[in-house]
């Protein structure tokens, strides 16, 4: 089986081979090394990220393991509380999702009954979901005639003499709990079908859930330390045996990984006496060091590890940066060379444990020398980029593209006086993320040629992006940028699926779409009903001029970095869900998808096999490569 995976990795440059590789990754984690000997753990959740950063056909596959199970169990995705909007019908009133729907109903009745309104104004009513407690309060205020009665009890003739009573239909709704509907007209009432929605858009639009990008850029830190984790191969999978730091100590333990990690954390704690935040800088640490430690992270150690952040029980924070994501694809030695430090080799990862023990003294020395070189290169690069991309600082970002684009957007915002905002809590972020679709939409599995947008940068730099805080609207306004919760119905005739949905048997579903995607889907014949939207009244104008100025500045500093950065920006939008320019990525991806669809409109649908926001697979027999296709490149 190892031989089979090794062959697949060497030829993983087409969709079919990569899909076969994914099948293995459902059962195994691939242990691989690059040319410099740096370990890479490849699993189902990170293969796409790895392929966006490097050519995986050049990696050496060392082995397979089933032991790193923590990496195969994805962390739970935060879920917003399901939401039902308020419905005020002539026959009934259904309050929006609330912990106390009965209180909402009595307040609604007070709009029509002045004596209830007066009682609510004079006397407070405690929040409660108990009908008997509400009735007790009404009775104590001389308002017993408005007592709450359940619909089923009323139909049993028990309360017919109370003509003014508040009749409520009681129900339990999954993932929401108890809900009540006030029945205004018994003659015309039938229990309504209420849309249970994944988001409360009105809540998400609240001002306090949005912050200006510029306000998050002015951050400082005290200390930077380079770090590397080394792993050996054992019968139970890869095992960390050494953690090296510079400036700092080297920790070695072949007998207990728990003790190795605890000693490292104790040292971190000791050096944080004068600061609450330090920066650890690794190289390819997101691909090996951090996931390997995550597998062995001890319970109840006083620290939690969340992706690239360590947080202690007393609030101290360690940001673990991966300098590789700022290298534009350079090897460690090339990165050090291009940023002015002496390139040094490092110990190989994923060697046998017995070999690591035998050579440990030389490994410790070699690791320290390599980390010193990385430290000097990183300090030089961070100083240079923080001048060119002020006020952006490297440690605030997870990769160079994110830092570069944020600096461009911030500069345009300053010049125009219109700033971009970003969501500050999990639910509002999740709503924005839900509008981003990076998946391939499969039409058929015929043999195809792959085409990619020639320059993503050209497309996205000439478009407009949201400025300011969003407003809640029931339906978006044509010509304005907005993101809406939508009920989507697919066309009944044969069609190319434009809106991604993972259930082929469902013809109507609820999803989040940008105004750009709504326009594209409508052109494709979809029926879309908007169920609430975040809308922006102002736009940041096109970024092209500022983008070109920024590229020129970096080019003057380092041509290799600039050329590689430009290539990455042209080929990809590497979406990052923790980015403060999340809104930019959302609309940039939608603009690219609209462009892909405009090309698909010129091609007979029988020739289209699959597509994503930046790529299009066309049947090999298709020969009519028109002028529009000149904006794509064949891979």
Swiss-Prot record:
It comes from the Viruses. It is found in: Virion membrane; Host endosome. Induction: Expressed in the early phase of the viral replicative cycle. The keyword Cell membrane does not apply. Its main location: virion. Keywords: Early protein, Host endosome, Host-virus interaction, Late protein, Membrane, Microtubular outwards viral transport, Viral release from host cell, Virion, Virulence. GO terms for biological process: microtubule-dependent intracellular transport of viral material towards cell periphery. GO terms for cellular component: host cell; host cell endosome; membrane; virion membrane. InterPro entries: Poxvirus_F12L (IPR005005), RNaseH-like_sf (IPR012337). Belongs to the orthopoxvirus OPG056 family. Plays a role in intracellular enveloped virus (IEV) transport to the cell surface through microtubule transport. Together with protein OPG064, forms a complex that interacts with host KLC2 (kinesin light chain isoform 2) to engage the kinesin-1 complex and thereby promote IEV trafficking. Interacts with protein OPG164. Interacts with protein OPG064. This is Protein OPG056. It comes from Variola virus (isolate Human/India/Ind3/1967) (VARV).
């Amino acid at each position: 089986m190892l031989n089979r995976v090794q062959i697949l990795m060497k030829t993983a440059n087409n969709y079919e081979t990569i899909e076969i590789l994914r099948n293995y990754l459902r059962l195994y984690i691939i242990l691989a090394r690059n040319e410099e000997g740096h370990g890479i753990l490849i699993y189902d959740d990170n293969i796409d990220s790895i392929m966006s950063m490097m050519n995986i056909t050049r990696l050496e596959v060392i082995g397979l393991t089933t032991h790193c199970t923590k990496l195969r169990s994805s962390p739970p995705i935060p879920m917003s509380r399901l939401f039902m909007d308020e419905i005020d019908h002539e026959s009934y009133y259904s309050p929006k999702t609330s912990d106390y729907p009965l209180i909402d109903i009595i307040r609604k009745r007070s709009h029509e009954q002045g004596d209830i309104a007066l009682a609510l104004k004079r006397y407070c009513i405690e929040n409660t979901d108990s009908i008997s407690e509400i009735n007790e309060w009404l009775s104590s205020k001389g308002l017993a005639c408005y007592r709450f009665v359940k619909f089923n009890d009323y139909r049993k003739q028990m309360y017919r003499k109370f003509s003014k009573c508040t009749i409520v239909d009681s129900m339990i709704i999954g993932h929401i709990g108890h809900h009540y509907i006030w029945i205004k007209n018994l003659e015309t009432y039938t229990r309504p079908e209420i849309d249970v929605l994944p988001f409360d858009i009105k809540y998400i639009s609240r001002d306090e859930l949005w912050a200006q990008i510029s306000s998050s850029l002015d951050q400082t830190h005290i200390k930077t330390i380079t770090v590397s984790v080394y792993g050996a191969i054992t019968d139970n999978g890869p095992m960390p045996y050494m953690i090296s730091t510079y400036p700092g100590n080297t920790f070695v333990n072949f007998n207990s990984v728990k003790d190795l990690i605890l000693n490292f954390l104790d040292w971190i704690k000791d050096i944080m006496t004068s600061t609450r935040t330090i920066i650890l800088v690794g190289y390819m640490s997101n691909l090996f060091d951090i996931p390997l430690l995550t597998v062995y992270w001890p319970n109840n150690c006083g620290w939690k590890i969340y992706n690239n952040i360590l947080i202690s029980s007393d609030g101290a924070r360690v940001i673990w940066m991966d300098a590789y994501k700022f290298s534009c694809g350079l090897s460690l030695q090339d990165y050090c060379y291009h940023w002015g430090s002496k390139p040094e080799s490092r110990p190989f990862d994923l060697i046998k444990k017995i070999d690591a023990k035998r050579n440990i003294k030389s490994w410790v020395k070699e690791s320290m020398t390599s980390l010193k070189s990385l430290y000097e290169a990183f300090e030089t690069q961070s100083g240079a980029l923080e001048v060119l991309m002020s006020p952006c600082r490297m440690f605030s970002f997870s990769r160079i593209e994110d830092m570069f684009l944020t600096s461009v957007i911030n500069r345009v915002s300053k010049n125009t006086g219109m700033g971009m905002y970003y969501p500050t809590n999990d639910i509002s972020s999740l709503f924005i993320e839900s509008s981003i679709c990076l998946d391939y939409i499969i039409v058929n599995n015929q043999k195809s040629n792959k085409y990619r947008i020639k320059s993503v940068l050209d497309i996205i730099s000439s478009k407009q992006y949201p400025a300011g805080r969003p407003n809640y609207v029931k339906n978006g306004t044509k010509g304005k940028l907005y993101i809406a919760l939508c009920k989507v119905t697919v066309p009944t005739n044969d069609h190319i699926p434009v809106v991604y949905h993972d259930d082929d048997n469902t013809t109507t579903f609820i999803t989040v779409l940008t105004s750009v995607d709504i326009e594209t889907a409508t052109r494709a014949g979809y029926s879309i009903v908007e169920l609430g939207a975040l809308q922006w009244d102002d736009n940041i104008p096109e970024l092209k001029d500022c983008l070109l100025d920024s590229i020129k500045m970096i080019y003057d500093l380092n041509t290799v970095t600039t050329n590689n950065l430009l290539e990455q920006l042209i080929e990809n939008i590497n979406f990052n869900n923790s980015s403060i320019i999340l809104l930019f990525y959302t609309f940039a991806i939608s603009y690219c998808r609209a462009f892909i669809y405009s090309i698909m409109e010129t091609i007979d649908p029988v020739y289209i096999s699959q597509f994503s926001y930046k790529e299009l697979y066309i049947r090999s027999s298709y020969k009519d490569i028109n002028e529009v296709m000149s904006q794509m490149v064949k891979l």
